[in-house]
Swiss-Prot record:
InterPro entries: UPF0178. This is UPF0178 protein lpg0089. It comes from the Bacteria. Pfam families: DUF188. PANTHER family: UPF0178 PROTEIN YAII (PTHR35146:SF1). Belongs to the UPF0178 family.
Length: 148
């Protein structure tokens, strides 16, 4: 199994947790981004640099991932595509996207997008809290334990 990171928007503290986990468990980790990233020197960690452009990283991930791979993303449409491809999608806050909750998340995303298009301020996500960081680490550990 492989962990994929939609890396351009993934917080550094979450990437650091993922790096340590990949090295500790000998799990392949692939960062996909449209800008250069630094990461630890490890045979289990690599990056893919995609062209700048709308959804290029998303397309690369969905084209190369396999069923049961884990994708770390806050991008709801990408999470939906991962689920269709039988992968597991998790947000950097530790929230698992599932077939049961992804439609609601897509609907909420679309409503917020319509509000923004109409000039409404919907605000962005709050800063990552210590509790969310812990939730992410715990959810990752559960996935790693199940996948080995």
């Amino acid at each position: 199994m492989t962990i994929w990171i939609d890396a351009d928007a993934c917080p550094k503290m979450i990437k650091d947790i993922l790096f340590r986990a990949a090295i500790r468990t000998n799990t392949n980790l692939i960062l996909v981004a449209n800008s250069y990233l630094t990461y630890p020197n490890s045979p289990f960690i690599r990056s893919v640099l995609v062209e700048k452009g709308y959804d290029r990283a998303d397309h690369y991930i969905t084209s190369h991932m396999k069923a049961k791979d884990l994708v770390i993303t806050a991008d709801i449409p990408l999470a939906a595509e991962v689920i269709v491809k039988q992968g597991l999608a998790m947000s950097p806050r530790g929230e698992l996207f599932t077939a049961n909750n992804i439609k609601q998340r897509l609907t909420l995303r679309d409503i917020n997008e319509q509000l923004r298009s109409a000039g409404e301020r919907t605000g962005g996500p709050s800063a990552l809290s210590a509790k969310e960081k812990t939730n992410f680490a715990n959810a990752l550990d559960r996935w790693l334990a199940k996948s080995k």
